[in-house]
Amino acid sequence: MALWIRSLPLLALLVFSGPGTSYAAANQHLCGSHLVEALYLVCGERGFFYSPKARRDVEQPLVSSPLRGEAGVLPFQQEEYEKVKRGIVEQCCHNTCSLYQLENYCN
């Protein structure tokens, strides 16, 4: 497949995120190969690093205790659990992100 055809999603991203566009148009849902291509575009020669968290690293343990509430979390742990740092997929695929937010994932 021609390189220019594969670059179309990046071109669209550049057009919608250029100066003079509205804030809503600048933020995009970027998933899969579109996210990787956008990172290559934003990071350039610096490159980027992404290490997906294992599911067990972000889930709560299934231990039950009489002190735990309905959600299985101790009352003082709930706030800490909600502060888990979002990864790039959560930030840019599940939600929308800007090119400036993508730069946070560059080396």
From Swiss-Prot:
The keyword Signal is annotated on this UniProt entry: yes
An example Gene Ontology biological process: cell population proliferation
Cleaved signal peptide residues: 1-24
Location(s), subcellular: Secreted
GO molecular function: hormone activity
Propeptide residue interval(s): 57-84
Name of the protein described by the UniProt record: Insulin
Name of the coding gene: INS
